[in-house]
């Protein structure tokens, strides 16, 4: 049986340092049967502060403001009670050593997909293929391929306008926007991809 805690219970954290906040967040997640409680607490706080997890762990003794503590408590509750993935809570996910925005309703990039990107890059490393990404979602596949295959271009198709909006933002963040044509459509309705 899951242990449920309310936002009010989490809000009673009266904490001033990152070390204390990470500990309380980790304890809360552990009580709610989150196996990755420690790393999740660290990732949430580092994401909210805007530092890498490593940088956060090096400097755990500075004071936090109430606004950040409130955001942390809300995020920990989303993870522990609602079971939301960290990527959706932070609205970002690293893939192929690149940063991608993600959003509920768009699949979170998975490490296994990096194996596919790796094989495609290895196979086409001396070519300039025209890439077609059907169901692009966050755009992580086509953007990662274009970062490696410097002279390639491609088309990203998705039926979801929300997904395409996120994919376009990701292409701008990762400097590939000028090499991708985005199409909002079902692949079954498209005749010409160029």
Tell what function each PLM region has.
Residues 25, 75, 166-167:
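Aromatic/hydrophobic pocket-lining residues that form π-stacking "cages" and hydrophobic walls in ligand
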Residues 46-122:
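Conserved AdoMet
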């Amino acid at each position: 049986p899951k242990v449920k805690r309310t936002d009010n219970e989490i809000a009673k954290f009266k904490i001033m340092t990152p070390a204390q906040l990470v500990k309380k967040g980790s304890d809360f997640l552990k009580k709610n049967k989150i196996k990755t409680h420690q790393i999740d607490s660290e990732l949430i706080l580092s994401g909210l502060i805007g530092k890498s997890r490593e940088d956060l762990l090096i400097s755990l003794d500075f004071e936090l403001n109430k606004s950040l503590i409130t955001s942390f408590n809300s995020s920990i509750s989303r993870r522990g009670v609602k079971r939301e993935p960290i990527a959706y809570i932070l609205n970002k996910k690293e893939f192929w050593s690149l940063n991608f925005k993600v959003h509920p309703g768009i699949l979170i990039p998975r490490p296994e997909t990096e194996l596919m990107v790796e094989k495609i890059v290895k196979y086409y490393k001396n070519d300039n293929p025209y890439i077609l990404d059907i169901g692009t979602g966050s755009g992580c596949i086509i953007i990662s391929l274009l970062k490696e295959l410097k002279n390639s271009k491609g088309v990203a198709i998705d039926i979801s306008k929300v997904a395409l909006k996120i994919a376009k933002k990701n292409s701008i963040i990762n400097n590939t926007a000028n090499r991708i044509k985005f199409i909002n459509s079902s692949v079954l309705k498209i005749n010409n991809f160029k």
